[in-house]
Each structure stands twice: as C-alpha cells, then as structure tokens.
C-alpha cells in the first residue's frame, strides 16, 4: 500500500474500492491505482456543495490529486471523473458482481503495489458496463485475481505429471491441485482451452469465444472451487 512510502504529492488515475464516512463531512476512501492501493481522506465531500462530491463515485474512473503529509492518510486535493460505468447501477445483478470484485481487490491489494490489480478491476467494470455475461466476467476475474496473487492454477499437467491430452477427460483433484484422468470427468479439451485463455488474455477476447450455458456454468463452478 502506497501510504507507507515517503512522498509528497501525486496525480494518478484510480477507482474507489471502499468508502467510509468520517467525522461530520469527510470520507475515508480505499483507492486502487496503477501504482497500488492508497487510503486517502476526502475532506468535506459529504457537504451539499462540495466540489469533490460529483467527481468521486463508485464504479467510476477518476483522476486524483493526492497530498501526503504526516497523517496516515493521503489528502485528496483534487478529483476529476474520467468515466462513469453507469450501466452497472441500473442492474442489481451487475451491482452485486461489481461489489464482489471491489471487495476482493480491496483485500488482495492490501500489501501489494502490483499494477495488475488495477488492470483486472478496470476490465471487469468495463465488461459489466458493456453487458458481457456475468458468469464469464466472474470466472475471468477470479482466475486473474489468483494469478496476480502469484497462485497459478495448473492447466497443463495431470496428477501423474503428463501433459493434458486433447482426447482425454479429466476431473479436478483438490488434494493434488491438478486434473486427474477420469473417463467420466466433466473437463475435456474445450473446457481446458477456455480456462487457459481466461488466464492469459483480456476479458473482451474471452467474451468473444463461443461457449454454451452448460460449459460456462461448469467453468465458473471450477474457478470458484480453485479460487
């Protein structure tokens, strides 16, 4: 988290992960930026005529100016909204998925300055706003969150150490953290190809892959288990 690093002023793009009312008119904000997570205070933001209020919203990309002094929090001295993903707030299911994404990013980025957290959050919000299948968004997000945390899912070798074969069926062995050969297994070449794709390319590319509802459900169940 950036607050522990000595600095004075920065300008950065960011998303609000969490906001908590503080004192009479202020808010403490958890922000994710390309430089990592920042905790900053927005003074007077809850006042009716606050200049900051309209520029700091959930599900929005904002250009922040932040001053760092002796306080444990940064101080937001300026903010300008760059993009608001308005379609998210029009749909309860989208809002629930977005809230899950924000919560997980907030936790995962606590002790990291990895720019990937900003990237995968942004792609998730763009996908939600654009109407990409919610199950595909969740599966892609969980796969990439795990990868960003340094926990790769084994999608290339089975429990016996052999390369996964296109003509074989597999089931997931939780204990071995790998696919095991299983004639009745629910995972074949098509499912594994999509999982590999999810862990290596952008969400918008995955969204173009043709997959029926049954396959999407199967992939999401798998990612929830391993994630």
Give the predicted meaning of each segment.
Residues 1-28, 32-227:
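Non-catalytic alpha-helical scaffolds and adjoining flexible linkers that form interface surfaces
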């Amino acid at each position: 988290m950036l607050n522990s690093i000595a600095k004075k002023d920065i300008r950065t793009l960011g998303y609000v992960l969490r906001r908590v009312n503080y004192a009479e008119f202020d808010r403490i904000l958890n922000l994710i930026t390309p430089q990592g997570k920042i905790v900053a205070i927005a003074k007077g933001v809850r006042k009716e005529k606050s200049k900051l209020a309209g520029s700091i919203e959930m599900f929005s990309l904002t250009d922040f100016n932040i001053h760092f002094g002796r306080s444990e929090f940064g101080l937001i001295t300026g903010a300008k909204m760059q993009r608001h993903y308005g379609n998210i707030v029009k749909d309860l299911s989208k809002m629930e998925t977005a809230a899950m994404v924000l919560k997980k990013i907030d936790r995962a980025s606590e002790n990291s300055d990895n720019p990937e957290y900003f990237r995968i959050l942004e792609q998730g919000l763009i996908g939600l706003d654009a109407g990409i299948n919610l199950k595909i968004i969740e599966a892609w997000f969980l796969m990439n969150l795990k990868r960003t945390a340094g926990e790769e899912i084994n999608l290339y070798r089975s429990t016996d150490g052999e390369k996964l074969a296109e003509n074989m069926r597999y089931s997931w062995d939780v204990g071995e953290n790998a696919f095991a050969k299983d004639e009745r297994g629910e995972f074949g070449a098509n499912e594994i190809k999509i999982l590999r794709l999810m862990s290596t390319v952008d969400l918008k590319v995955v969204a173009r892959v043709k997959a029926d509802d049954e396959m999407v459900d199967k992939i999401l169940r798998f990612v929830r288990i391993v994630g």
